[in-house]
Amino acid sequence: VPPASPSAGAGLLRSAAQPDAGAIARHIFVDAEERPIPGVTNGRDYVIYAFLPESYEAHPERRYPVVYVCDGYWDGPLIRTIYGNLLYDKTAPEFILIGFGYPGEHADYGKLRRWDYTPAVDAVPDGGAPDTGHAAEFLDVIEQTIIPRVERAYRADPSYRVLAGSSFGGLFTLYALFAKPGLFQAYVAASPSVGFANDWLFHDEAEFARSAAARAVHARVFVSGADHERPASFGAIQRFNAQMRAHATPGIQYQYRIVDGEHHAGTKGESYSRGLRFAFAPLVSPEKK
């Protein structure tokens, strides 16, 4: 597939406009704005990385759907690259991309994401302090602080939000569907760690499927796994897929894909490409699909 270029249309995400320049910190990506999110409801500081469509300044009348991605410091640049290909193929609309991140030159991303993206306390070896189980608090931060700030600062369309993530980020993405259905309209979970804490998410999904919220939800959900994952991880994803299909929540349009020949992290590229195409299918005219 040839890469998208500015000459191919509004294909590339550009650096975000600066409506609040005094609050903007250093740029860690060439074409992204890093905006601090301090003093939030859980007492922890965050940053967001904002990438805007190239047409953003030229069309002030337009509003854009938003993709929020976990691990923005890793997966933001990846989705930004995939974005150009999606636009070239006309399989997604222009969208704003917001990556979740953490401040500091030496932030321990592994530790921080484990704290924020997991919905339950997992067993801790040697009796150490738990470092998991704060997904509910982080989801509150997203709902009460990050989304409102994004929708004030940018011309974001509040009617179509997508949440995406991989591994623990994929676990969090699915947790968000069951915990706050309706906050997002589509979910992309690449190789999600659904076996975490003795299949905790399976119980969340089962409770959700029995709830009144499940009868009212309208969402598109994409899940992937890799056939070269660790057997326990791939087995958990397969079992989760079977449970989702068995419950068949009417308002959820669900797609599952096994990425052939890949390991855990290697699912990201194909998963985000296919997942975003699936997420945005309702916004793409039939002749462009």
Feature roles, as predicted:
Residues 5-289:
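Non-catalytic cap/lid and distal C-terminal segments of serine-dependent acyl enzymes
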